[in-house]
């Protein structure tokens, strides 16, 4: 399929979810299943022998873990809610959709898979520590927070990987046929993006009342961080000839997890930042697909 058609489909999905957000938000319960299928078909084309941890991950880990808390401590001097939202936009781990996007862009899918597994594990431990020092009404015990986050992340990441590995071992013929239809992951992603866009818009409209200055700052901050993280990842990745993959490491965020963490552990309004990030990262991905055509 030509890249310009992919770009048009993604933009159409964003517009459709935005316009008919009330309708598509009703299907949010199907998002985990869609993400599971999306990863399953993406993993069918991955050579798991190439999944390994690389030295270039270290600086990216330091950025996400270190800069996120540093920015939080600086911004909280102005406003706690804004600080939490900004921190989530940096701390949020790589989205599973980054694996699909990487394959569309011709990036190193195994590399993105490796970093995604690593950063999701790290964040599941680090995030509860950070949440414990924040100004929140109800502090959830550390190990309970870790358990909740791990249960939210890893079934979607690990189970499809184990399933694909099992198929590769048991039936090479089935594995070969599945590899030929990995394009299905893109179509599933389009459906998932439409639902996510609708759910996000619905959430933003419901939360979007009260302190309008903070709301605007959350949305603008998400835009600035989205552009910065894609660019930082891209130019950092050039050192290792892996720029498209590195851009996905940092730029494509697991916003579903970030929104859930905000609503579960932090001030609910801070979730507007990762919610807005959904919109911006989809526009960036549309631009990347268009540029690659």
Language model regions located:
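Alpha-helical transmembrane segments of multi-pass small-molecule/ion transporters
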Residues: 1-293
């Amino acid at each position: 399929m030509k890249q310009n058609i992919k770009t048009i489909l993604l933009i159409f999905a964003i517009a459709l979810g935005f316009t008919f957000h009330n309708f598509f938000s009703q299907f949010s319960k199907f998002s985990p299943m869609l993400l599971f299928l999306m990863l399953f078909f993406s993993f069918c084309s991955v050579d798991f022998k190439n999944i390994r941890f690389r030295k270039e991950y270290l600086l990216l880990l330091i950025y996400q873990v270190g800069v996120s808390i540093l920015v939080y401590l600086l911004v909280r001097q102005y406003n706690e809610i804004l600080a939490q939202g900004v921190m989530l936009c940096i701390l949020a781990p790589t989205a599973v959709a980054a694996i699909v996007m990487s394959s569309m862009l011709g990036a190193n899918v195994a590399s993105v898979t490796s970093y995604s597994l690593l950063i999701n594990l790290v964040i599941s431990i680090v995030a509860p520590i950070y949440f414990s020092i924040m100004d929140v009404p109800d502090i959830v015990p550390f190990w309970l927070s870790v358990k909740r986050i791990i249960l939210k992340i890893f079934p979607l990441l690990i189970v499809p990987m184990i399933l694909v590995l099992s198929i590769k071992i048991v039936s090479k013929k089935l594995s070969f046929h599945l590899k030929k239809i990995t394009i299905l992951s893109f179509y599933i992603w389009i459906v998932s993006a439409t639902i996510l866009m609708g759910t996000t818009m619905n959430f933003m409209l419901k939360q979007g009342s009260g302190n309008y200055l903070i709301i605007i700052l959350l949305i603008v901050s998400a835009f600035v961080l989205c552009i910065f993280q894609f660019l930082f990842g891209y130019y950092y990745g050039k050192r290792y000839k892996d720029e498209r993959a590195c851009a996905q490491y940092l730029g494509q965020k697991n916003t579903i997890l970030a929104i859930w963490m905000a609503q579960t552990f932090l001030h609910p309004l801070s979730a507007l930042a990762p919610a807005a990030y959904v919109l911006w990262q989809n526009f960036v991905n549309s631009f990347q697909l268009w540029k690659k055509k």
